[in-house]
Amino acid sequence: MKWKVSVLACILHVRFPGAEAQSFGLLDPKLCYLLDGILFIYGVIITALYLRAKFSRSAETAANLQDPNQLYNELNLGRREEYDVLEKKRARDPEMGGKQQRRRNPQEGVYNALQKDKMAEAYSEIGTKGERRRGKGHDGLYQGLSTATKDTYDALHMQTLAPR
């Protein structure tokens, strides 16, 4: 099949030769000079626009460096700004709806401090667990769950599949 297409393409090429660039006048030196001139003018215009935008932006930025009406101001590392003085009173917590924070007891903290005297004999305090009971109770498996959650787990316990 490929050789039929190749033969047909060769016959069409011999029968109808392709148009040459010379017949359209594209190799005329006057046309080349005209296109070169257009390209040169385009390059000059683009370069002028680029330089104008670059230099006008830097001059404009220097003039309006710290305008109070601007949404964003650039950082000025040469000038040091002072922070607001924090109030010594307890601040209102926005996460608690503006209410004052109450002082927490050390026992209410999320993390407890390590007690080094107990850490010296850490492995001696680890006890061995008894053997778990197997059966319907699952009490050892669901330690620390409420009775409602335990009932849900018991109801959803995997059931054996019927043989096929």
Curated annotation (Swiss-Prot):
Sequence ranges of Basic and acidic residues compositional bias: 87-96
Cross-referenced PROSITE patterns: ITAM_1
Spans within the Extracellular topological domain: 22-30
Recorded name of the encoding gene: Cd247
Keywords for the protein's UniProt record, in alphabetical order: Adaptive immunity, Cell membrane, Immunity, Membrane, Phosphoprotein, Receptor, Repeat, Signal, Transmembrane, Transmembrane helix
Cellular component terms per the entry's GO annotation: alpha-beta T cell receptor complex; cytoplasm; Fc-gamma receptor III complex; Golgi apparatus; plasma membrane; T cell receptor complex
Quaternary structure, from the entry: The TCR-CD3 complex is composed of a CD3D/CD3E and a CD3G/CD3E heterodimers that preferentially associate with TCRalpha and TCRbeta, respectively, to form TCRalpha/CD3E/CD3G and TCRbeta/CD3G/CD3E trimers. In turn, the hexamer interacts with CD3Z homodimer to form the TCR-CD3 complex. Alternatively, TCRalpha and TCRbeta can be replaced by TCRgamma and TCRdelta. Interacts with SLA. Interacts with SLA2. Interacts with TRAT1. Interacts with DOCK2. Interacts with SHB. Interacts with ZAP70. Interacts (tyrosine phosphorylated) with SHC1 (via SH2 domain). Interacts with PTPRC.
One Pfam family cited in the UniProt record for this chain: ITAM
Domain notes: The ITAM domains mediate interaction with SHB.
Cleavable signal peptide: 1-21
Name of protein: T-cell surface glycoprotein CD3 zeta chain
Membrane protein topology class: Single-pass type I membrane protein
Reported phenotype of the disruption mutant: CD3Z deletion causes severely defective thymocyte differentiation. Absence of CD3Z also leads to altered dendritic structure and motility in developing retina.
Tissue spec. comment: CD3Z is expressed in normal lymphoid tissue and in peripheral blood mononuclear cells (PBMCs). Expressed also in retinal ganglion cells.
InterPro entries per UniProt: CD3_zeta/IgE_Fc_rcpt_gamma (IPR021663), Phos_immunorcpt_sig_ITAM (IPR003110), T-cell_CD3_zeta (IPR024128)
Topological domain spans for side Cytoplasmic: 52-164
In-chain residues carrying the UniProt-annotated modification Blocked amino end (Gln): Q22
Function, in words: Part of the TCR-CD3 complex present on T-lymphocyte cell surface that plays an essential role in adaptive immune response. When antigen presenting cells (APCs) activate T-cell receptor (TCR), TCR-mediated signals are transmitted across the cell membrane by the CD3 chains CD3D, CD3E, CD3G and CD3Z. All CD3 chains contain immunoreceptor tyrosine-based activation motifs (ITAMs) in their cytoplasmic domain. Upon TCR engagement, these motifs become phosphorylated by Src family protein tyrosine kinases LCK and FYN, resulting in the activation of downstream signaling pathways.
One of the record's GO molecular function terms: protein tyrosine kinase binding
Region (Disordered): 87-111, 124-143
Modified residues (Phosphotyrosine): Y72, Y83, Y111, Y123, Y142, Y153
